Design a protein with these regions (language model features):
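Early-domain small/polar-rich strand-loop-helix modules and first-structured segments
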Residues: 1-73, 131, 194, 360
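Gly/Thr-rich phosphate-binding beta-strand-loop-beta motif of the actin/hexokinase/Hsp70
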Residues: 1-24, 33, 154-189, 239, ...
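Phosphate/ATP-binding catalytic cores across multiple sugar-kinase/actin-like superfamilies
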Residues: 87-101, 149-156, 275-301, 316, ...
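Glycine-rich phosphate-binding loops at beta-strand->alpha-helix junctions
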Residues: 109-119, 296-320, 338
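Conserved phosphate-binding/catalytic loops in two-lobed NTP-binding clefts
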Residues: 132-144, 317-343
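Phosphate-binding glycine-rich/basic clefts of nucleotide- and phosphate-handling proteins
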Residues: 180-269, 340, 354-412, 447, ...
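Membrane-anchoring helices that localize proteins to membranes
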Residues: 435-456
């Protein structure tokens, strides 16, 4: 008997969810130690954790965005590390943080829906190298985080059956929008739009600049030095924590520790709203443009589902509700929706055909620098069973996975769920006159024979 476990991978946070307990969230930071297993997250992620060790380790960041990259990550001490294996170690540390055992768990991992097939395959291959993640020769099931999040929200709040739903994932590196059909087991009906100008990192940066405006010239921070970089990173982390507190509180305090300046400033929710107002407006306009490109409108959506850490910001829900006039569904823990959905899929224990849940090789068109991707009518969508999606690239930039996909069913099964494809038939060549044979002159043959006799 295996216990179900759901994991989710984000650019800034990793989440683990298991039955009967609150999901565990850690920053996508891995600390390597020579005498013990690696630790995931920041020391202040959990006051009861064992991250606060007396001996400092080697801190690794940025490995989530480097999965599948052949170039190794270089740490501060000069050592090199494979980003794929770092991701596996971070996932294993998340399993331990959730109080589970990877060897005795039925694991489903929610990966970003915009990942390329090669990225997904690289993670799958790396998972097979870890004995804890390989049970009976099978690696954990990888699912798109969009599908996992929809299952989580549907189980908690109930999504109306029939019609199209707009899924908005407010993540740390950007906001991702996918139109999904609720009448076909949450099948995507559009390419995923990646909007990078409204993200958790951008909000943190805006709040950091606001702090510098409040502090003025009292701080003597030199960002060119190693000490200055460390102090700036700590201040940015405090800004992130203050942003998260303002999702439930109307005012919070932020400690500022800089060379020549040690103070505490107050930040209100109204100030944060002013900082993100323009970015949120630009995102809503980009969403309008995406709907128009897909020949739909807000009235065609049955509801709007918001997930991700940014969905907890009250202003986001207010603006979407006023603009769309549609019901807004947000889970109780939107940042953990993908992990919770992966847990539900692992609990079912059924094998789901994800060929219709993700796409590869979408013909895309970017317009006006908005990062919007459209699938023109009549174009062919190529489906990869094991890979997730390759949605963010234009057609001239699409990279196809170099790993062959095994056929697990009749490739000509017309009853299987799939996207309709338009076949380009080649017309047979017209009848051409018979090709004239080259004539060989008798004189040429005689000259050749004489030359051969002379040589002998």
């Amino acid at each position: 008997m295996y216990d179900p476990l759901g994991l989710s991978i984000g650019s800034t946070n990793l989440v683990a969810a298991c039955n009967g307990s609150t999901p565990v969230t850690r920053r996508a930071v891995l600390t390597l130690y020579p005498h013990c297993a690696p630790k995931v997250g920041m020391p202040n992620d959990d006051s009861d954790s064992d991250l606060k060790l007396s001996e400092p380790g080697t801190t690794m960041t940025g490995f989530v965005g480097r999965i599948g990259d052949s170039v190794a990550l270089v740490s501060a001490d000069g050592s090199t590390h494979d980003p794929d294996l770092l991701m596996v170690e971070a996932l294993d540390a998340m399993v331990c943080a959730a109080g589970a055992d990877s060897c005795s768990s039925e694991i489903a991992i929610a990966v970003p829906a915009y990942w390329k097939p090669g990225t997904v395959q690289a993670l799958r291959d790396a998972l097979r190298t870890h004995i804890g993640f390989v049970r009976s020769g099978m690696a954990p099931r990888l699912v798109p985080d969009s599908l996992a999040a929809m299952n989580a929200v549907n189980a908690e709040l109930g999504i109306p059956v029939g019609g199209v739903v707009g899924l908005l994932d407010f993540g740390g590196s950007g906001t991702y929008v996918t139109l999904m059909d609720t009448g076909s087991d949450f099948e995507p009906v559009s390419a995923t739009m990646r909007y990078l100008d409204f993200s958790g990192a951008e909000i943190d940066q805006a709040l950091l600049l606001h702090v510098f405006e409040q502090v003025g010239h009292r701080g003597n921070l030199d960002p060119a030095t190693t000490t200055g970089i460390g102090q700036l990173s700590q201040l940015r982390e405090r800004c992130r924590e203050a942003k998260e507190r303002l999702s439930t509180d109307t005012v919070t305090e932020l400690a500022v520790e800089l060379p020549g300046c040690s103070t505490t400033i107050q930040v209100t929710r109204a100030q944060l709203d002013d900082l993100i107002q323009d970015r949120l407006t630009a995102f809503i306009y980009a969403f309008d443009d995406m709907l128009a490109r897909n020949k739909t409108s807000w009235t065609d959506l049955t509801t709007v589902v918001t997930v991700g850490g940014g969905a907890s910001i009250p202003l986001v829900r207010q603006r979407l509700s006023l603009h769309t006039r549609r019901p807004i569904l947000t889970a109780k823990l939107p940042a953990a929706s993908a992990a919770t959905g992966a847990l539900l899929l692992a609990t079912r224990g059924e094998r789901i055909d994800y060929r219709t849940k993700s796409s590869l090789g979408l013909l895309a068109a970017h317009a006006g620098g908005t990062g919007i991707i459209e699938l023109p009518a009549g174009d062919v969508m190529v489906i990869d069973q094991d890979a997730m999606t390759d949605r963010e690239l234009a057609w001239s930039q699409t990279e196809y996975g170099d790993v062959p996909v095994l056929l697990t069913r009749d490739p000509y099964d017309e009853e299987a769920p799939c996207w309709s494809m338009r076949l380009n038939l080649l017309e047979p060549a017209k009848d051409l006159p018979p090709r004239r044979r080259r004539r060989v002159r008798v004189s040429q043959v005689l000259i050749g024979l004489c030359a051969a006799v002379a040589m002998t």
